[in-house]
Amino acid sequence: MASNSTREKLIALAHKFCSIISSGDMEAVLALRTESCLTYQCCPSFSTRPLNNQETREYFEEWKHIGWNSKFWIIDEGTMVVDEAAKKIAFRAACSADTIGGPYENENLVILQATDDCALVDGIWEFFDAVRKQDLMNRLAAKQAAKGLDSWCANTHSGDDKGVPANNESKVAA
C-alpha cells in the first residue's frame, strides 16, 4: 500500500486544522502544533504580533467569553497552493461566529508551515478582511460601553452576557 503523497498530506493537514479550529477543543488545537509554532495574524492596521502556543490558548479563552458557534472552513480546495518542497499550503477560508456584538463572518487566506512529515503545523499566517474585523471590534466596543465596562469581563458576566474586550486591540479570533 503506497503512502500518501506530500501534497495529499498537506491538504489533509489543512482540513484537519480547520476542523479542529471549528471544534473549539483547545487541547486538540495545541496538539496539532509544534511546541515552537507561531501564529501571525497578518493585518498591519491591527498592529498584531506573533502568538506562541500559550498566547494562542489565552486568545481563544478570551474569545469564548464573547463568541460561540465558531466555524472555520476551506472555501475552495481548487484554489489551494501546495508547496511540497517547502511543506507549505495556502488556502482561502471563511469563518463565522455568533458574538455578543452580533453575527460575525470573515474571509481568510491561511498559510500553514508543516513539519517534515506533514503531521504537525509549525507556523501559521492568517490574512483577514480588516474592515469586517474592525466592524466586529466596533460592535463589541459599543456593547462594552453600554455596560460601562473597561476591561475583559469574563469573570463579571451573568446570563448570556459573556463579556467584551476593553479596547480595539486585535484579540478576537479571526
From Swiss-Prot:
GO molecular function list: isomerase activity
Record EC number: 5.-.-.-
Pathway involvement of the protein, from the record: Secondary metabolite biosynthesis; terpenoid biosynthesis
GO biological process: paraherquonin biosynthetic process
Key words of the record: Isomerase
Domain of life: Eukaryota
InterPro entries, alphabetized: Fungal_Meroterpenoid_Isomerase
Top enzyme class: isomerase
Family recorded in the similarity comment: Belongs to the trt14 isomerase family.
Subunit structure: Homodimer.
PANTHER family found in the cross-reference section: AUSTINOID BIOSYNTHESIS CLUSTERS PROTEIN F-RELATED, AUSTINOL SYNTHESIS PROTEIN F-RELATED
Function, as annotated: Isomerase; part of the gene cluster that mediates the biosynthesis of paraherquonin, a meroterpenoid with a unique, highly congested hexacyclic molecular architecture. The first step of the pathway is the synthesis of 3,5-dimethylorsellinic acid (DMOA) by the polyketide synthase prhL.
Protein name: Isomerase prhC
Protein's organism: Penicillium brasilianum
Gene: prhC
